[in-house]
């Protein structure tokens, strides 16, 4: 089996350029295609040159059908609309689809579940080892500490991030909800303003900060009477997400079709 041919979607963006770099540095993987929006000034440029790793002979295009038809996997940190298009194409081509796109709605997730009948999909709000380990710890803490400890999740990202709470914050919220054996949507508290009254019992609160060039910071608070536990993760470089995504793609190659998470890739299931 030769190198895994990977298409980088959103190759002209910050995350896309890092993905190109990491794929080219990873043994057993290569960039076979690079996609960008039709209005991108990067169309026609060599993806490696744009990413700062030298010419790789792959020009950035706007044709996902052609790119996906000639690859083994897709690395997708784009938008929900683009992810849905790529999910359909990846399912048709039976290739691995690694999704780091955030802001996905329940309808989007249902469509991914359907696409996963025909392809390997690895979807996560965060691809880093540290965050996924944090999620496992949050689940255990929520289960162990019990409802007398209030759960609050705070996150901060760069000023250009368009969705809130972040996908990682929601990943951590889902982990906390699982630990408490509750449903996150019906217990999620995302806005406080004015006279809010007392904190709802059993709520999982979210606070989102935006500013500067912050890659990503997350902290989960378990606040009890007389004591507080804080679990945190700080991302200092986008390469941690790219390395996780490439690891997920290589892990998914040859695997049975289905919808997987980074916890599956990292084998975190029942180890904590």
Curated annotation (Swiss-Prot):
Q: Which controlled-vocabulary keywords does the entry list?
A: Amino-acid biosynthesis, Cytoplasm, Diaminopimelate biosynthesis, Lysine biosynthesis, NAD, NADP, Oxidoreductase
SUPFAM superfamilies referenced in this protein's UniProt entry, alphabetically: Glyceraldehyde-3-phosphate dehydrogenase-like, C-terminal domain (SSF55347), NAD(P)-binding Rossmann-fold domains (SSF51735)
Q: In which pathway does it act?
A: Amino-acid biosynthesis; L-lysine biosynthesis via DAP pathway; (S)-tetrahydrodipicolinate from L-aspartate: step 4/4
Residues that bind NAD(+): 10-15, 100-102, 124-127
Gene3D superfamilies, A to Z = Dihydrodipicolinate Reductase, domain 2, NAD(P)-binding Rossmann-like Domain
Q: Which residues form the active site?
A: 157, 161
Localization per record: Cytoplasm
Q: Which family does it belong to?
A: Belongs to the DapB family.
This one is known as: 4-hydroxy-tetrahydrodipicolinate reductase
């Amino acid at each position: 089996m030769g190198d895994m041919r990977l298409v980088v979607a959103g190759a002209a963006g910050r995350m896309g350029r890092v993905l190109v770099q990491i794929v080219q540095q990873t043994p057993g993987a290569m960039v076979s295609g690079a996609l960008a929006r039709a209005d991108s000034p990067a169309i026609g440029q060599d993806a490696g040159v744009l990413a700062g790793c030298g010419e790789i002979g792959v020009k950035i295009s706007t044709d996902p059908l052609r790119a996906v038809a000639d690859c083994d996997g897709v690395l997708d940190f784009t938008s929900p609309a683009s992810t849905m298009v790529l999910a359909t194409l990846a399912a048709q081509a039976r290739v691995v689809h690694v999704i780091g796109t955030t802001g996905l709605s329940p309808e989007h997730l249902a469509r991914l579940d359907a696409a996963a009948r025909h392809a390997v999909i690895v979807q996560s709000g965060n691809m880093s080892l540290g965050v996924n380990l944090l999620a496992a710890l949050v689940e255990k803490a929520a289960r162990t500490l019990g409802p007398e400890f209030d759960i609050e999740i705070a996150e901060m990202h760069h000023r250009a991030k368009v969705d809130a709470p972040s996908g990682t914050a929601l990943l951590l919220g889902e982990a906390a909800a699982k630990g408490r054996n509750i449903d996150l949507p019906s217990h999620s508290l995302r806005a406080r303003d004015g006279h809010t009254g007392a904190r709802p019992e059993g709520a999982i609160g979210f606070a989102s900060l935006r500013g500067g060039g912050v890659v990503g910071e997350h902290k989960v608070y378990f606040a009890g009477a007389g004591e507080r536990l804080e679990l945190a993760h700080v991302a200092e470089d986008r390469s941690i997400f790219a390395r996780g995504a490439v690891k997920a793609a290589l892990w998914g190659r040859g695997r049975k079709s289905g919808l997987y998470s980074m916890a599956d890739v990292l084998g975190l299931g029942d180890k904590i």
